[in-house]
Amino acid sequence: MKPIRLFSGVLILAVSTLAQDTKTAAVATAPQAQASQPAPTLASAIDREISDIEKQVLDAADAMPEDKFNFSPESLNLPGGNYKGVRTFAVQVKHIAASNYFIWSGITGDKLPDNLKDGNGPEDVKTKAEILKFLRNSFALGHKAAATLTPENMLQTPGHSKSTRLRLATFGVAHAFNHYGQMVEYLRMNGIVPPASRTKSD
């Protein structure tokens, strides 16, 4: 799926979520409204989308046994397949985290981790525990970025970026969803049902 379609889909989903939440809040009775959560905002709608993909990616990463973290489809030598040079599962996860930092730091202005040099993530982050920590920290930056969004600043282009704050926020989500789909295939190639797809019998 092309990045622009992913971005558009995430943006539509976020706007739909905000609209639905606003509609629900509007029809609540006065006592119910007082007892309910605060009215949704642009920031909370984007934050909800980040939370959704964060859970799926983290659960999928945690589901892969550590001894399979360096798995790549190239090792299967599938007939008719061409997986030469594709990322290992570990690097897929680190790529999501690295991209989260690169994308969302454009909104927050946070300094990148000293050991983050490229899109494949730090070379010294190797164990499953280290990779999951790196991943969690990258999503924490996403939540920080979402919290800064307002209707007034969402179309501003921060710093040296050519993209608006809103596009950066939603593109981070779209990019993570793209690579989550690849993580799912890696899990299934190893006989593991992704947590988000499991039933009670799994």
Regions found by a protein language model. Give the residues of each.
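Bacterial N-terminal signal peptides that target proteins for export
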Residues: 1-8
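Acidic/histidine-rich alpha-helical segments that form the ligand environment
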Residues: 49, 122-156, 164-177
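Short, contiguous alpha-helical
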Residues: 47, 51-58, 70-119, 157-202
